[in-house]
């Protein structure tokens, strides 16, 4: 085996492109396998893009469903380089918690080499391809028992690896509300996914437990000197916000 491509079972090879302010969507099929194979030979890792419901955090009306400052503290307590308060709030305010595809990227434009940002070279665990011929540049996947974050810990050990960002999308159906997409049943619009749905609530709770369990190890790896201070800060934020 030369290459290994990760593809989550709640992701589909299409891009959702928003048409203007009305929110009608153009769906564009994506050739994920071919696109990764095109670039992986000259890389250690290739990583694509996600659109749709890119995190298991449901939509909430800030200061109506929940106090914004408390929600901000919660997100900060579980955040990493990929999930941050700024990115979550922007999606809520701009597009009801949905990430839409960039048309140029969906058309295969814009490949580039992704560089280490100081604490790692950040990737996520799907639309992720590994070059097994460069096994010395591929760190292990690991997460604490019952936790999330195996792609996060993988990322912090990619500092000396060559990562190519490839212009191809997966649609992430994080709440399994659009499984018809695999049969090319494409909705004209995407709806807000709220926590009032019991299945959505349980998905969010499970994800939250996983984030809380992995955060101490992430803090230790990325900032040992301030570990005790940051763990205490996180604990206080969780105590106030949960």
Indicate residue ranges for each PLM-predicted region:
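Short, electropositive alpha-helical surface patch
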Residues: 24-25, 33-38, 42-43, 58-83
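Short, flexible, basic/aromatic active-site loop/helix in glycosyltransferases
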Residues: 68-120
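Conserved nucleotide-sugar donor-binding
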Residues: 113-114, 118-139
């Amino acid at each position: 085996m030369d290459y290994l491509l990760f593809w989550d079972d709640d992701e589909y090879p299409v891009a959702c492109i928003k048409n203007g302010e009305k929110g009608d969507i153009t769906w564009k099929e994506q050739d994920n396998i071919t696109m990764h194979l095109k670039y992986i030979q000259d890389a250690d890792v290739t990583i694509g893009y996600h659109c749709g419901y890119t995190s298991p955090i449901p939509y909430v009306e800030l200061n109506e469903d929940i106090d914004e400052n408390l929600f901000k503290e919660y997100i900060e307590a579980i955040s990493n380089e990929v999930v941050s308060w700024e990115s979550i709030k922007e999606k809520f305010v701009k597009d009801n918690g949905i990430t839409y595809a960039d048309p140029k990227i969906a058309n295969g434009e814009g490949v580039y080499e992704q560089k280490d940002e100081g604490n790692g070279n950040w990737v996520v665990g799907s639309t992720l391809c590994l070059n097994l011929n460069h096994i010395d540049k591929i760190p292990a996947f690991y997460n604490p028992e019952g936790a999330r974050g195996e792609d996060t810990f993988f990322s912090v050990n990619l500092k000396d690896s060559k990562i190519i960002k490839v212009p191809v999308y997966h649609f992430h159906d994080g709440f399994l509300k659009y499984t018809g997409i695999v049969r090319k049943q494409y909705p004209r619009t995407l709806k807000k996914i709220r926590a009032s749905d019991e299945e959505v609530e349980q998905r969010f709770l499970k994800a939250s437990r996983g984030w809380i369990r992995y955060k101490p190890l992430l803090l230790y790896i990325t900032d040992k000197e301030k570990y005790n201070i940051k763990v205490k800060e996180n604990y206080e934020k969780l105590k106030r916000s949960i």
